[in-house]
A protein has these predicted regions:
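Accessory nucleic-acid engagement/destabilization modules that flank
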Residues: 2-8, 14-173
Length: 173
């Protein structure tokens, strides 16, 4: 149903990628004494922002022109955090999503989540472009993966983004 939404340029679908990552994450969590449910949820959410048409289009392009703001799929993935009701689980999964490519801040090249602070409003606007459309497909994928889903408005997505900013700021000295 969602085979047109890819995770990688090699043709693997986003849904398959999230299923594969979840299997590995659950196995690792069980073997090291961590919560497998949190591992599964984090694995499912970590790349869900790849459902954005911006990411999908950039995935198809071979020679990408340099642009002022690179699409960071992990930022778009944050828009779905309110599907997790438990605050502690949500905070743990927030760290998983934010840190799976870059650090929270002072990343090499100043590309950590908090390093984007000076372009905060532009960052949200860019990553949430057409959210009302692509979020339906992202939620459809999550539903196929066994999640209880509900519509997420652009306002709720912004609230999730703002909550993540506040939480990440609380982690830094």
């Amino acid at each position: 149903m969602f085979d047109h939404i890819l995770a990688k340029s090699n043709g693997i679908t986003l849904q398959q990628h999230l299923e594969d990552v979840a299997k590995i994450a659950v196995c690792v969590a069980q073997n090291v004494g961590l919560d497998p449910e949190i591992a599964r949820m984090g694995a499912h959410l970590h790349d869900i922002g790849k459902a954005s048409p911006i990411f999908q289009e950039r995935l198809k392009q071979k020679n990408l022109p340099p642009c002022a703001l690179v699409f960071r799929h992990e930022i778009a993935s944050l828009f779905f955090l309110s599907l997790i009701e438990d605050v502690k689980k949500r905070q743990t999964i927030t760290r998983m999503i934010i840190a799976h490519h870059k650090s929270v801040c002072e990343d090499i090249g100043d590309k950590g989540f908090l390093d984007l602070d000076d372009i905060e409003s532009e960052c949200f606007s860019y990553h949430s472009k057409d959210f009302e459309l692509w979020s339906k497909e992202a939620l459809g994928i999550l539903k196929e993966l066994g999640w209880q889903v509900r519509p997420i408005s652009i306002e709720e997505a912004k609230s999730n983004y703002d909550e993540t900013l506040a939480y990440c700021r609380s982690l830094t000295p």
